[in-house]
């Protein structure tokens, strides 16, 4: 890029981004930046892989933008950052999309289509979606190693999962067995508890009577799942609860019901009984061992009747609500299963993986379980066993991918027994540092403590096959199985000839591979891994381990990972679980956990609600850099982000302000052939304001670095934007612009150039991780061939201690506050800043404020356009102020009686120069001609300024520091300069109309309707000529003419460029 080249008048994000994309391609900016840091200290970042099941949404965009910003920051800090992007390409997220595309309803459709065909479709879909996602990420300005992403479908990555699983097996942490799991009947596979999504639904709510076998009466249970009653195996009670036998009138007689004492009224109410009598009372422990009849024995002949079944047992999950007795079906419920295992009970589950009753369900065989609810309730009612039938609205689990209601059932699954290493998991968790830390110490710790064994098997097709081979007559003992850890081992063991370098490890390949050992043939188990196991090995899978040992030894574990807070139950957990099971260590050292991207109203973005904002829409409206700035101003530590179009527009406005600051000095620097390399800042003729802005830059740099290191890039960005907008644009540029307008090159002008150039270059470096496009364009324009090929190769700035001056910064804070108060006073007096004022009086409340004003009178004089700055020392009153008093008649009346009105009038009539009541008393006595005695309670004082003076208080950081008085009285000299400056502003605007170069000279013709105003303007003809580059004032017959209303006077101005004569 050419140094100080002409730039667009306005910041145009689209144009900037298009140019920068082209430039990056032209100079291989990413590749050169990576190469530039190749010898730096290694920083191992691991990208949490998004599913390749659709385009990027705002949450993905926030996540990827955060990652990109932190990668860029660490590169600028000198690190050699590993930035390999990852993609999760297996599992139900892909399968359900492909099923939808193919019009499939269930697994039977897949089987008819052909397993291999379906796997091929899944692979094509995943690759196709990857391309779209990758283009989305590139459009956000994200720099990662797009040419070499890790894909969970690649053989070397799948091998990493096999290897990790085999290591867990080596530690005796792998077992196969029955568990109660969440099953999606449509997908016909187990899903993890943390994958279950809850919706509010209406379900049956029934109270059922179980007939006692050895005594009169019924146990009463309550359930919302009538379809589990066929599998009822025992009833659970709280052994410490009191249970009552109540006798109720059924209309045809009486019957005895056994319910928990706290639940009697509820049961009686639901049963519609008019009255009841307590006929017995028992502790829960007394009920243990009671036997009962299965309520659906006739309908389900194979219902549990085995040893120990249909008895009452104590359990710790029983609560004192509904009936106080719990229907327990170990073939379904998780706690039921666990208690059943403790009791040594067999498992009865007459339901298939598709949620359809099997033959063992008797009359209900062939029905989908939820569809059978009505028939089961009808049968119970017909037998007189349905005490109450109603509905309940509650949260019920659904499949995370297809939204089908789940069913709880017991199946054979493969597990990594993380419960055996809970202490190790918790210890490894402590080795990682989290931002925010409380997420680790609360939410994550609780999840680990409560997590069951990890069900790693899925009964699906598109996933990493579980690398276990078993014999046909396998007993279920894992020691009798063969676990394969690598492709090399697979090639060595299988009966078929395969190339370990090229073999595809997917199901359609490995299912055909057999292993023969000691005369026994082994075949692979049919399941694939839980997709969370795929991504759980990312920390070594992205390094190509176990194939690539060098990188693993050098880099592992990860220095940093970052994802949203839902990953405490997802990727954060699965990585810790697999890292601990396989290697005994946490696979990451630092975790940054951000929130979710929500709609403007705080609700989740949803197609059904219609409140989704696509990232491309945001880019189209405002540009990638403003979108990134908005996303990066959000707290990344656990808080959810509410999308806001207004805030995104504000960020575009911030960048436009920066653009204007950047654009302002370029023509002057070009005109003067300014060479920043020839001016050393520490030797330049710096003025106070230069020293101040350099000190502010150093302070902001230090504060930003501290925020970045604490993973609060949002706070760092707040500091930077405030510096750009408030310090540089609204203060520094306003002060130094006249130095840059000077006709001759001076030491002062060069110092201003050098200062602003340095500030802008350093600012682009600080901005680069946030807004890489506009930072690139500004940096290139300011540095040309003298800088790096890209700003992203530059070092992150260090605070320059040479220029740190906290006192000066505080001084200018006070000066800026005085200036703001002075501007407010001008507005009250309706006096524009272009018009000078005779004086500004600053009454400081404290010595520090007074010192700052005194030290910087010249700066204040310039900023306030005042001929003189007067300072009133703290503790003193400005002598030109006077005070009037207002009487309080509620106090005067009782004191002065009939004279109160006369006293009040006298108080209101006088003015004093002191707010002491004694001074007022003396003035009133003079007014009345007699002595009186006043007290503080009788009056309140008002401050009166001299005519033409307005006063406004000034504050710093919310603290009152004094009052600024602006004397706006007009003199002929002030009017003359004021009108002249009004003319200058209009002529400058007309120069812009003609798009004149700053050095172009013009001729000017002024026709002023008011003769007095014309005379006043003539007095400052030289000032006007200097400011607008007027070669002469003359009568012009042609040129650019406009009529202006200036302070109610018509002024016709004509200008004509000298070069066009």
From Swiss-Prot:
Residues the entry annotates as binding ATP: 607
Compartment(s): Cytoplasm
Primary enzyme class: ligase
Keyword Acetylation recorded: no
Catalysed reaction, written as an equation: tRNA(Ile) + L-isoleucine + ATP = L-isoleucyl-tRNA(Ile) + AMP + diphosphate
Record keywords: Aminoacyl-tRNA synthetase, ATP-binding, Cytoplasm, Ligase, Metal-binding, Nucleotide-binding, Protein biosynthesis, Zinc
Motif annotated as 'HIGH' region, chain positions: 50-60
Gene Ontology cellular component list: cytoplasm
Motif 'KMSKS' region, residue range(s) on this chain: 604-608
EC number(s) reported in the record: 6.1.1.5
Entry GO MF terms: aminoacyl-tRNA deacylase activity; ATP binding; isoleucine-tRNA ligase activity; tRNA binding; zinc ion binding
UniProt xrefs under SUPFAM superfamilies: Anticodon-binding domain of a subclass of class I aminoacyl-tRNA synthetases, Nucleotidylyl transferase, ValRS/IleRS/LeuRS editing domain
Names of required cofactors: Zn(2+)
Family recorded in the similarity comment: Belongs to the class-I aminoacyl-tRNA synthetase family. IleS type 2 subfamily.
HAMAP family named in the record: Ile_tRNA_synth_type2
Function: Catalyzes the attachment of isoleucine to tRNA(Ile). As IleRS can inadvertently accommodate and process structurally similar amino acids such as valine, to avoid such errors it has two additional distinct tRNA(Ile)-dependent editing activities. One activity is designated as 'pretransfer' editing and involves the hydrolysis of activated Val-AMP. The other activity is designated 'posttransfer' editing and involves deacylation of mischarged Val-tRNA(Ile).
UniProt cross-references to NCBIfam families, sorted A to Z: ileS (TIGR00392)
Domain remark in the UniProt entry: IleRS has two distinct active sites: one for aminoacylation and one for editing. The misactivated valine is translocated from the active site to the editing site, which sterically excludes the correctly activated isoleucine. The single editing site contains two valyl binding pockets, one specific for each substrate (Val-AMP or Val-tRNA(Ile)).
Subunit comment: Monomer.
Protein name: Isoleucine--tRNA ligase
Gene name as annotated: ileS
């Amino acid at each position: 890029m050419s140094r100080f080249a002409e730039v667009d008048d306005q910041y145009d994000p689209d144009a900037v981004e298009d140019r920068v994309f082209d430039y990056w391609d032209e100079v291989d900016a990413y590749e050169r930046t990576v190469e530039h840091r190749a010898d730096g200290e290694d920083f191992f970042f691991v990208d949490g892989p998004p599913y390749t099941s659709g385009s990027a949404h705002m949450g993905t965009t926030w996540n990827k933008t955060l990652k990109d910003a932190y990668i860029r920051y660490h590169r600028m800090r000198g690190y050699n950052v590993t930035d390999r992007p990852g993609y999760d390409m297996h599992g139900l997220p892909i399968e359900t999309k492909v099923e939808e595309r193919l019009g499939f309803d269930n697994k039977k459709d897949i089987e008819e289509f052909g397993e291999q065909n379906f796997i091929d479709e899944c692979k094509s879909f995943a690759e196709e979606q990857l391309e779209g996602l990758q283009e989305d990420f590139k459009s956000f300005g994200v720099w990662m190693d797009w040419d070499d992403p890790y894909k969970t479908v690649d053989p070397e990555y799948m091998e990493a999962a096999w290897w990790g699983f085999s290591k867990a097996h080596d530690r005796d942490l792998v077992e196969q067995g029955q568990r109660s799991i969440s099953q999606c009947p449509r997908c016909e596979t187990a899903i993890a508890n943390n994958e279950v999504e809850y919706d509010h639904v209406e379900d049956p709510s029934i109270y059922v009577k179980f007939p006692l076998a050895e005594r009169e009466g019924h146990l009463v249970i309550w359930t919302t799942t009538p379809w589990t009653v066929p599998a009822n195996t025992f009833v659970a009670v709280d052994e410490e609860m009191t249970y009552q036998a109540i006798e109720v009138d059924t209309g045809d007689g009486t019957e005895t019901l056994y319910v928990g004492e706290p639940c009697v009224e509820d049961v009686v109410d639901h049963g519609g009984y008019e009255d009841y009598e307590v006929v017995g009372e028992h502790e829960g422990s007394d009920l243990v061992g009671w036997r009962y009849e299965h309520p659906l024995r006739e309908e389900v002949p194979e219902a549990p009747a085995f040893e120990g079944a249909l008895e009452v047992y104590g359990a710790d999950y029983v609560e004192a609500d509904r009936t106080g007795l719990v229907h327990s079906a170990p073939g379904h419920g998780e706690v039921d299963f666990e208690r059943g295992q403790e009791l040594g009970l067999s498992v009865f589950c007459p339901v298939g993986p598709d949620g359809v009753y099997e033959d063992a369900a008797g009359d209900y065989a062939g029905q989908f379980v939820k569809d059978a609810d009505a028939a089961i309730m009808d049968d119970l009612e017909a037998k007189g066993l349905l005490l109450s039938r109603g509905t309940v609205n509650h949260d019920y689990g659904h499949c995370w991918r297809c939204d089908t209601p789940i069913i709880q059932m017991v199946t054979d699954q493969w597990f990594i027994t993380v419960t055996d290493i809970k202490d190790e998991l918790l210890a490894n968790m402590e080795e990682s540092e989290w931002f925010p830390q409380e997420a680790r110490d609360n939410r994550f710790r609780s999840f680990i403590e409560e997590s069951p064994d990890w069900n790693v098997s899925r009964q699906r097709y598109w996933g990493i096959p579980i690398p276990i081979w078993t014999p046909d007559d396998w007993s279920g003992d894992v020691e009798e199985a063969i676990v394969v850890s690598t492709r090399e081992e697979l090639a060595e063991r299988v009966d078929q000839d395969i190339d370990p370098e090229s073999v595809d490890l997917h199901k359609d390949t490995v299912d055909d591979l057999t292993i023969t050992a000691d005369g026994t043939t082994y075949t692979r188990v049919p399941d694939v891994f839980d997709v969370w196991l795929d991504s759980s090995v990312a920390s070594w899978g992205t390094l190509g381990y176990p194939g690539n040992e060098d990188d693993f030894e050098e880099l592992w574990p990860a220095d940093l990972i970052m994802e949203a807070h839902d990953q405490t139950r997802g990727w954060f957990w699965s990585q810790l679980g697999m890292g601990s099971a396989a290697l005994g260590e946490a696979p990451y050292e630092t975790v940054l956990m951000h929130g979710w991207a929500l709609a403007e109203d705080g609700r989740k973005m949803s197609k059904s609600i219609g409140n989704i904002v696509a990232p491309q829409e945001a880019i189209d409206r405002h540009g990638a850099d403003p979108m990134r700035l908005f996303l990066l101003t959000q707290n990344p530590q656990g808080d959810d982000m509410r999308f806001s179009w207004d805030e995104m527009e504000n960020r575009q406005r911030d960048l436009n302000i920066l653009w204007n600051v950047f654009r302002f000095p370029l023509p002057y620097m070009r005109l003067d052939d300014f060479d920043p390399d020839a001016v050393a800042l520490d030797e330049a003729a710096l003025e106070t304001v230069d020293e101040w802005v350099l000190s502010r830059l150093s302070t902001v740099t230090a504060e930003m670095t501290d925020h970045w290191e604490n993973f609060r890039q949002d706070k760092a960005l707040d500091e930077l934007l405030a510096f750009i907008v408030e310090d540089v644009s609204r203060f520094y540029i306003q002060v130094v612009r006249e130095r840059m307008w000077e006709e001759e090159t001076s030491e002062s002008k060069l110092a201003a150039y050098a200062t602003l150039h340095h500030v802008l270059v350093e600012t682009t470096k600080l901005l680069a991780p946030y807004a890489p496009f506009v930072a690139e364009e500004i940096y290139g324009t300011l540095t040309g061939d003298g800088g790096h090929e890209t700003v992203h190769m530059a070092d992150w700035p260090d605070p320059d201690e040479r220029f740190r001056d906290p006192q000066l910064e505080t001084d200018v804070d006070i000066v800026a506050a005085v200036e703001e108060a002075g501007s407010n006073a001008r507005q009250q007096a309706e006096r524009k800043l272009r018009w000078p004022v005779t004086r500004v009086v600053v009454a400081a409340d404290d010595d520090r404020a007074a010192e700052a004003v005194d030290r910087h009178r010249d700066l204040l004089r310039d900023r306030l356009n005042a001929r003189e700055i007067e300072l009133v020392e703290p503790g003193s009153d400005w002598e030109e102020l006077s005070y009037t008093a207002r009487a309080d008649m509620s106090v005067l009346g009782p004191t002065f009686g009939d004279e109160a009105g006369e006293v009040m009038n006298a108080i209101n009539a006088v003015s004093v120069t002191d707010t002491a009541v004694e001074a007022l008393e003396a003035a009133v006595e003079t007014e009345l001609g007699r002595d009186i005695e006043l007290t503080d309670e009788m009056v309140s004082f008002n401050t009166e300024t001299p005519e033409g003076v307005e006063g406004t208080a000034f504050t710093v950081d919310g603290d009152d520091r004094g009052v600024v008085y602006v004397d706006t009285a007009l003199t002929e000299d002030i009017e003359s300069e004021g009108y002249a400056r009004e003319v200058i502003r209009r002529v400058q605007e007309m120069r812009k109309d003609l798009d004149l170069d700053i050095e172009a000279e013009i001729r000017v013709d002024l026709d002023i309707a008011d003769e007095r105003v014309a005379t006043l303007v003539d007095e400052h003809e030289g000032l006007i000529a200097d400011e607008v580059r007027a070669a002469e004032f003359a009568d012009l017959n042609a040129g650019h003419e406009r009529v202006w209303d200036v302070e109610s006077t018509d002024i016709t101005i004509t200008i004509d460029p000298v070069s066009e004569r």
